[in-house]
Amino acid sequence: MKEPSSPTDGNPNEVVVVTENAQDEVEIDLARWGALAEDVLNAEGVTGELTLTFVGVADIRELKIEHFGDAGDYPTDVLSFPLDDGMPVADGIPRLLGDVVVCPAVAKEQAPSHAGSVDDEIALLVVHGILHILGFDHATAGEQTEMQARERKHLMNFFWHGEAPDGFSFDHRAEVGS
């Protein structure tokens, strides 16, 4: 089911997050994750439309191979597909930011050794994917430090509403895609 996280009147100066759950491996609260995505985009001062989709293991593996070639025969946790190339859009037309695709089953598998809980892991992946849409990366140590600081800030402000829980870690598996 696809649904915007909040009603829209087509105003290009607002944030619209369209959410979809295309998997049945892990229960997903679309409104919760759509609201987190909206909060992050608003905090980053970005307007436009973002799609946030939750898919199964087979689908994310297929997307990874299709878009990144033979990058290993394993699923990843999150993929980001930016659409906005920085070109101006016509008046009255919202900017299409891109698509963030999260695999809750992979999040569930890696959560105990990473973020701690499944919810913390999914929250981190949503924020991580959005930051990639906005042009942030973690290819160098400096980029990684900046990206993790932004992730922590957004999670503290909009998800935990305070400090990170015990057991939360930013250390990611080496094979996890962006």
Where are these regions (language model features)?
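An acidic/histidine-cluster motif and surrounding catalytic segment
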Residues: 1-121, 134-178
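Short active-site segment of divalent metal-dependent hydrolases/proteases
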Residues: 127, 131-135
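Pseudouridine synthase
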Residues: 121-122, 129
